[in-house]
């Protein structure tokens, strides 16, 4: 594990634990998600995954040499994440959401903020 990643894990541990014990997540794990909620989750996820590489590229381009390790981390993950939007599209197809609906879907303000301000 790289030092950068190890430090990232330590620094985000409290937030990760809060997420893992959030009542909505615990309820979904215990009882599952209604199909419509799962479709919405996938539609939101599609937009996050679709924008991951452009957002990462923009972030990497702004990093100076003092943050080379972060830049290389972003490059590596851009490569690893390429094409994952197709995985989400396949899941959307499997639950009856046509491609046209995915393209026309307006993501929530939360998703737009995540994609637009990172």
Each model region followed by its residue ranges:
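Active-site-proximal alpha-helical scaffolds that flank and shape metal-associated catalytic sites
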Residues: 69-118
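Serine-centered coil/turn micro-motif
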Residues: 2, 22-23
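Residue-level recognition of alpha-helical structural elements
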Residues: 1, 34, 67-70
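Alpha-helical transmembrane segments of integral membrane proteins, especially early/N-terminal helices
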Residues: 1-11
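Alpha-helical bundle segments that constitute or directly flank the non-heme di-iron/ferroxidase center
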Residues: 9-20, 27-64, 83, 87
């Amino acid at each position: 594990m790289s030092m950068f990643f190890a430090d990232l894990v330590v620094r985000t541990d409290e937030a990760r634990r809060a997420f893992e014990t959030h009542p909505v997540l615990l309820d979904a794990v215990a009882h599952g998600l209604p199909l419509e909620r799962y479709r919405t989750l996938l539609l939101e996820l599609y937009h996050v995954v679709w924008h991951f590489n452009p957002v990462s590229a923009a972030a990497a381009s702004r990093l100076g040499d003092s943050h080379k390790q972060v830049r290389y981390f972003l490059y590596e993950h851009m490569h690893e994440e390429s094409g994952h939007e197709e995985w989400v599209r396949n899941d959307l197809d499997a639950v009856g959401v046509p491609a046209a609906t995915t393209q026309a879907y307006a993501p929530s303000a939360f998703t737009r903020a995540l994609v637009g301000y990172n």
